[in-house]
Amino acid sequence: MMQTQVASRAGYSNLPQFGAGIAQDIKTQAINNLKECLKLTTINRFLTSSYEEDAKSVERKIFSAVYQMTKIGLIDREKREINAIWFTFVGLSAQNIRHLEICSITDFNALFSITNQELRSLADRGRLDVETKRKLLQSTVILQNHWNAYHSRTSSGSTDEPSGQSTPAIVTPSPKFNVPSLSVTSAKMIQSSSMGFATTPKSPKTSSRLVHAIPHKWHRSTKFRFSGDAVCHFCQRPLGFGFLNAWEKCRSCKWKVHTQCKGRVGDSCGLTPDHLRFLFDKLIQENNGGMWKDPQSVPGSRSMNEPAFQFPDTAIDSSSSTNSSAPSTPALPAGISGNVSSLTAPYRSERKFLFPDTENYSVHNRLPILVISEGDHPTTTEIQQETENHNKSAAASMSGNIESEGTIVANHEDSTGSQEVDSEAAPSQEAVDKFNKRADGGFTWERHAWNMSTIRGPNAQASWNEVTIQFETIEFDKQAPIIGRGRFGKVLRGFHYGDVAVKVYTMEHISDASKKAEEFKLEVSAYKNTRHDNIALFLGYFMSDGQYGMVMSLSKGSQSLYTLLHVVREKLDLATTRKIAQQICQAVSYLHTKKILHKDLRSKNILLESKNKVVITDFGILSMKRLAHPKQKSGYLTSKFWTNYIAPELAMAMRTEYDEYECDDFPFSENSDVYAFGCVWFEMLTGALPYAGELPHQILFAKTQGIRPVLPNVKCTQELKELLVSCWNTAPQDRPTLTDINLKLTALPKKPRVNRSPSFPVMMKSYESTF
């Protein structure tokens, strides 16, 4: 599809004068080249998390467009049709495409003749949402880069084109005659024409790669500099001011370096920090660190001598690269598959609830059974009983699992009961130190995942020792040690250089005792790398005699948002509601920038130290493996109201029975956290839970069918309703980010403070009075 400008820009209208036979040969050769470039349509993997249902029909349209491009003399209508097919495949709506056509973007010549800034301005004028605008800009850049890369292969051996002329679209050369080509001059195409890519080796045995080798265009400035604030982009030292300081500037990327540093920069023009940041983010998402997927689902590394990350512009061995092919095939960047048939994968959020196969399960055609706890808060008798048990034992009991009512919720496990951890099942010291041990002067690389928590190097053990706390050094409150308990453990009140909250977890969901310490360290790493005013402060962790827990700062005098809304039943005004929502967005979006997912965002996990301070707790802990333990018959043991917050894609991932070796974990993502935030936002607006009064299996069924919660008679502005509905979009990629939500909440006008005399009231309607 990316070749759709071949005919119009390569001058195919002149082909008949050379004869039908020659024209047919060129047509056949062009089709072969175009089919190879159709593999580049896997660019959609960079744009969306999954594919749409009509991917097959889009592919057929693209193939049809390829054949149309080989026709002689395309008319404007055909060009518009091909252009619309590409934009549709990228993800633009018919209204967006119409807007671009009105702005004279009718073909790829016009698309490549404008700069990124101009294209962004057109998208803003067309009121494209943030996600659609990102798709348009990103697809245009990648599309043009692949055109230039393919052109460098087809024109190997030829001289460089003069600056100022654009790289033409893919031209099929012929040994008998030269096909004239059209060129378009623009600022954007000038930059692209200067991009030089390494020539792909002719031998298929050698590595095939795409190298970032763009030379800088240095020129020495003779102007007198009054300011000495500028620094060298290479050595980060000041450039100085005046004529005596020798420095040069690149005409293309505007880099400024010392003259002595120029020779060490290399051909890196255009390799901006934003580009490197995009590659780094893509690295985290593709490798799926421990915070993104369950560690068992992350594939191990191929070799300890191989780099943990292959940039698209670094060499890739041909034996392991799916892009290695014959010399006539263009080299593709790493991460882009060459299998066109993979485009037909169905879009997950649009499929219905899948029941398990009848031959594998004894229960058929029904949703999983969710066993709900009887209450959300421990009774006085239960707390006293737990206190007596604690005073009798040297350490706290390991029953349950901490859920977060830290938020602390009392979970009544009737049929399953509490199970204490056997001290004999505690992992050995060798298993505990396995993560960071050294042998023979080298490192033992535990490459289960590449993530922030994997600390490599000689200081790895020292870094973990800084946050390791001996369980015996923690003093527990003898009168009332139990603050609360939840689905995944207990929270105890203790003293360790100050008042602390000790969260004790069970790791019974890990069948292999030797892996419990390693799995717990992966969970701890999510807390270990966070520092935010609205996130519970992590002080350390302990692993002793089969006991696993974390020491957190104690929020004194705090209560959960759930307690405030549903127990105290306090009504929140708009100013307080917005302030709480903004702090939630800031805290969770901070976790997302750290590549950490909350996974269990709900009002019970949101503490209020005051109406001006929010604390987020219990993130990154929930998993299907934890939820499935202890094993229930055709269901799961969950806390109350848990199903009210889960996203539709999580509801569709649940099965009636869980198999550790066959079932995948929940498809958690940033979008699922956004859906949960929408439910919390609904609670603060209405004082009620979404799907209130419905049974858990009814809620699961409604979410798998795309049925949204009913909006009651909420007296609020249209902006707030639209914000709420956008968080509940069935398609995950259509939901806004928490950063965008925070910006929208900030943009809402605040209630002005009006100083007026009681004798003369002002008859005006404030913004908050509509709430």
From Swiss-Prot:
CDD domains: C1
GO molecular function, one term: zinc ion binding
Annotated signal peptide: none
Disulfide cross-links: none
Residues holding ATP: 483-491, 503
Cofactor(s) the record lists: Mg(2+)
The protein's enzyme class: transferase
Record's compositionally biased regions (Polar residues): 152-169
Enzyme Commission number, as recorded: 2.7.11.1
ZnF Phorbol-ester/DAG-type: positions: 215-269
Effect upon mutating residue 630 to L/S: In ku146 and n2522; restores vulva development in a let-60 n1046gf mutant background
Stored InterPro entries: C1-like_sf, Kinase-like_dom_sf, PE/DAG-bd, Prot_kinase_dom, Protein_kinase_ATP_BS, Ser-Thr/Tyr_kinase_cat_dom, Ser_Thr_protein_kinase, Tyr_kinase_AS
Active site: 600
Composition bias type Low complexity, residue spans: 318-331
GO CC entries: cytoplasm
Domain Protein kinase, first and last residues per copy: 477-748
Region (Disordered) location: 152-172, 290-339, 414-433
Biological process according to GO: cell fate specification; defense response to Gram-positive bacterium; meiotic cell cycle; myoblast migration; nematode larval development; positive regulation of Ras protein signal transduction; positive regulation of vulval development; Ras protein signal transduction
Catalytic reaction equation(s): L-seryl-[protein] + ATP = O-phospho-L-seryl-[protein] + ADP + H(+); L-threonyl-[protein] + ATP = O-phospho-L-threonyl-[protein] + ADP + H(+)
Record annotation: effect of changing residue 531 to H: In ku68; egg-laying defect in 14 percent of mutants. Arrest at the larval stage in 12 percent of mutants and abnormal sex myoblast (SM) migration. Restores vulva development in a let-60 n1046gf mutant background
Keyword list, A-Z: ATP-binding, Kinase, Magnesium, Meiosis, Metal-binding, Nucleotide-binding, Serine/threonine-protein kinase, Transferase, Tyrosine-protein kinase, Zinc, Zinc-finger
Pfam families in UniProt: PK_Tyr_Ser-Thr
Family: Belongs to the protein kinase superfamily. TKL Ser/Thr protein kinase family.
Functional description taken from the UniProt entry: Serine/threonine-protein kinase which positively regulates Ras-mediated signaling probably acting at the level of let-60/ras or/and lin-45/raf. Involved in sex myoblast migration. Plays a role in responses to M.nematophilum-mediated bacterial infection by promoting tail swelling and preventing constipation. Functions redundantly with ksr-2 in the Ras-mediated regulation of larval survival, the development of excretory canal and in mpk-1 phosphorylation in somatic cells.
Quaternary structure and interacting proteins, as annotated: Interacts with mek-2.
Protein name: Kinase suppressor of Ras A
